[in-house]
């Protein structure tokens, strides 16, 4: 508000363009002994560009520009994966393979504000503002060799064991330079036991590594907060991971009447990732994705989905 009872008006113009494409394919060959070779590839690209301009609407009907924000990014991803599956013994098979992924982000951000200084046509005729990490190229090369063993112990029990080793290199160039290597070992055990045809017990143990969103590395626009025009990037961001311990029991009601399940699980988080305060002053409010440390989470969950057969409405499910 311009005064106690005097409203002020602003207008924003936010044109943008988006384009994307993806191509992929797979091939599978089965040998005479029953073994299988599979390979696949995926290549995609996402191009985004937006320009945000804000104008003060003056009392006489004219307008005065006070913000120019231009964001352009190109995200490319290329993945290739190959694996070989063979039968070991009766009820057991083993799949071994490797995956390679390349991800590239080119990001550019320009901010112009009304104020004292030399205006620039490339900044909408406003005064250019310096933004840390505004022009950046980020590239990741990741390899994942893996082995997956499936064992049908008997007609009621099965066990899946997988071992994955993830190694990656992330290099950032442009306004900032940073190059880092990450290595993670990701085991998984998934045990299932059909106590009865209706009652199943599942025990799961695994290590989960959450991939970093490349947009968190670079400065970006913030269209949800008028008090903060840009979101800061974090060149030192690390992937977070957690150990997952999960015990699940599921009971299927007779006559396909529904499902009741109980789930108890624990997460042990490391380098947990969320937005953190990186404001430089009380008037320059900023946030960025960051690693906040370790923690534990316990969850007990009960679920039920029941068909309303007793009300002669078998197609209605109450959850």
Predicted features along the sequence, with ranges:
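Feature captures outer-membrane beta-barrel proteins of Gram-negative bacteria and organelles
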Residues: 185-193
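Surface-exposed loop/turn segments flanking beta-strands in extracellular/periplasmic regions
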Residues: 2-8, 56-67, 103-133, 182, ...
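Surface-exposed extracellular loop regions of Gram-negative outer-membrane beta-barrel proteins
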Residues: 47, 104-106, 169, 179, ...
């Amino acid at each position: 508000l311009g005064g106690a009872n005097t409203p002020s008006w602003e207008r924003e113009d936010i044109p943008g363009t988006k384009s994307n494409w993806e191509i992929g394919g797979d091939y599978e060959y089965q040998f005479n002994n029953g073994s299988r070779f599979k390979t696949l590839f995926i290549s995609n690209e996402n191009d985004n560009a937006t320009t945000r301009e804000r104008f003060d609407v003056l009392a006489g009907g004219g307008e005065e520009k006070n913000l120019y924000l231009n964001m352009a990014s190109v995200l490319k991803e290329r993945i290739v994966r190959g694996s070989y599956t063979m039968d070991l013994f009766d009820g057991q098979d083993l799949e071994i393979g490797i995956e390679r992924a390349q991800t590239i982000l080119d990001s550019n951000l320009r901010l112009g504000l009304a104020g004292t200084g030399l205006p620039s046509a490339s900044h909408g005729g406003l005064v250019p503002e310096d933004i840390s990490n505004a022009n950046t190229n980020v590239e990741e090369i990741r390899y994942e060799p893996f082995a997956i063993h499936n064992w049908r112990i008997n007609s009621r029990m099965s066990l899946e064991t997988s071992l994955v080793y993830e190694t990656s290199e992330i290099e950032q160039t442009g306004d900032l330079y940073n190059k880092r290597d990450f290595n993670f070992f990701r085991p998984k055990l998934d045990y299932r036991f059909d106590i009865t045809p209706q009652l199943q017990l599942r025990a799961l143990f695994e290590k989960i590594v959450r991939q970093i969103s490349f947009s968190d590395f670079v400065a970006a626009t913030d269209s949800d907060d008028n008090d903060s025009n840009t979101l800061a990037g974090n060149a030192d961001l690390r992937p977070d991971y957690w150990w997952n311990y999960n015990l699940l029991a599921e009971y299927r009601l007779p006559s396909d009447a529904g499902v009741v399940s109980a789930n108890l699980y624990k997460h042990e988080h490391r380098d947990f990732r969320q937005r953190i305060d990186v404001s430089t002053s009380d008037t320059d409010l900023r946030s960025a994705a960051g690693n906040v440390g370790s923690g534990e989470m316990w969850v007990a969950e009960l679920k039920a989905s029941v068909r309303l057969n007793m009300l002669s409405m078998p197609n209605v499910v109450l959850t």
